[in-house]
Amino acid sequence: MDKLRITGGSPLRGEVTVSGAKNAALPILCASLLTAEPLVLGNVPQLNDTSTTLRLLGRMGVRAERAGDGTVTLQADQVDNLEAPYELVKTMRASILVLGPLLARFGQARVSLPGGCAIGQRPVDQHIKGLAALGAEIEIEHGFVVARATRLKGASIRTDMVTVTGTENLLMAAVLAEGQTVLENAAREPEVVDLAELLIKMGARIQGHGTDRIVVDGVARLHGARHDVIADRIEAGTFLCAVGAAGGDITLRGAAPDTMGATLDKLVEAGLTIETGPDWIRGAMHGRPCAVGARTHEYPGFATDMQAQLMALDTVADGTAVIVENIFENRYMHVQELCRLGADIDIDGHTAVVRGVARLSGATVMATDLRASASLVIAGLAAEGETLVDRIYHLDRGYDRMEVKLRALGASIQRVTGKETA
């Protein structure tokens, strides 16, 4: 099992390119099921989750070709299997995103209940509620969501909570439904907007994406299209937290600063110097960061996917920060591992109190989920001595060659196998 060996204490300097967003790429790949014509996607990140999605689509009969430049060409003109099996779904919750497209185009689907990061229940009940409102008959059978519909019919749907994957699933189902669908309490995330922009290129009629009310007028069929996946705002934020904790001066190319308002505001508050252009961000930190608190919220609030990384920065900051996790339960599993590095953190329910220390010291730590992995890497970069991060398969689910990019910025970080660390 691979690990990351980090020798901390070196500031980060230089520039790297931000990859395409994982949370946009996954639903966009699943949207290939909505048409028999080719879909050409650029800026698709090389991640375990995108590879798993491509394997899942391939199992269904979707043909996919991946080029070295991040371009993926998909064609779903020979789909012969409408089931998403447990062995593929168990590692990735986003695999539920095939449900809406399969049901909309083929009238049936059998999708295993999903897995993924162990950071809360994240139930699929809102997906089921919305698809049922569109006329689907849905049952849970032997661990599978089994759905059938002759043709979906437009409806007004208000989810009980804001759900990103729920909005995406219902959006993909609604584009081929008969009549008009209104999604109330819809997610506003840039990744939802990116999916909608692709669907519009494919011939869908969508208005209001980026607001909490999306209106979809269904069409009979969609056609092929060419689309570039939006830049990953979480990867960009992670690298900026890293330079905030370790110090230095970095530039991120291919970024989307207009999607990162809440994160950039927090980093400025922490003492980073931030400069932005249309597709780049420069972040510099000279000296010790200031402690900065945050409350996670749906977009455009501070993203739950940035909570662990900000906490890692706060561990070496001057002062005390209070972080409140409002989106997921059980999303403080990185705290125990940060404390192994010398962090001073107390947890009370959904609230974490982080008292900054002058220095962390390297140790062996274990990743528990995707963003927790990133927080441990950030802490390792800021720590004195050597840090060994175990179970980095979590990191590989959502970061495209993170250690390669960090080395390009001057970090002392290497991927090693279990044998090399024995």
Curated annotation (Swiss-Prot):
The keyword Oxidoreductase does not apply. Phosphoenolpyruvate binds at K22, N23. GO terms for biological process: cell division; cell wall organization; peptidoglycan biosynthetic process; regulation of cell shape; UDP-N-acetylgalactosamine biosynthetic process. The active site is at C117 (proton donor). It catalyses: phosphoenolpyruvate + UDP-N-acetyl-alpha-D-glucosamine = UDP-N-acetyl-3-O-(1-carboxyvinyl)-alpha-D-glucosamine + phosphate. One of its GO terms (cellular component) is cytoplasm. Pathway: Cell wall biogenesis; peptidoglycan biosynthesis. It is an enzyme of class 2 (transferase). The keyword Cytoplasm applies. It is found in: Cytoplasm. The modification 2-(S-cysteinyl)pyruvic acid O-phosphothioketal is found at C117. It holds the Pfam family EPSP_synthase. Keywords: Cell cycle, Cell division, Cell shape, Cell wall biogenesis/degradation, Cytoplasm, Peptidoglycan synthesis, Pyruvate, Transferase. It comes from the Bacteria. Cell wall formation. Adds enolpyruvyl to UDP-N-acetylglucosamine. This is UDP-N-acetylglucosamine 1-carboxyvinyltransferase.
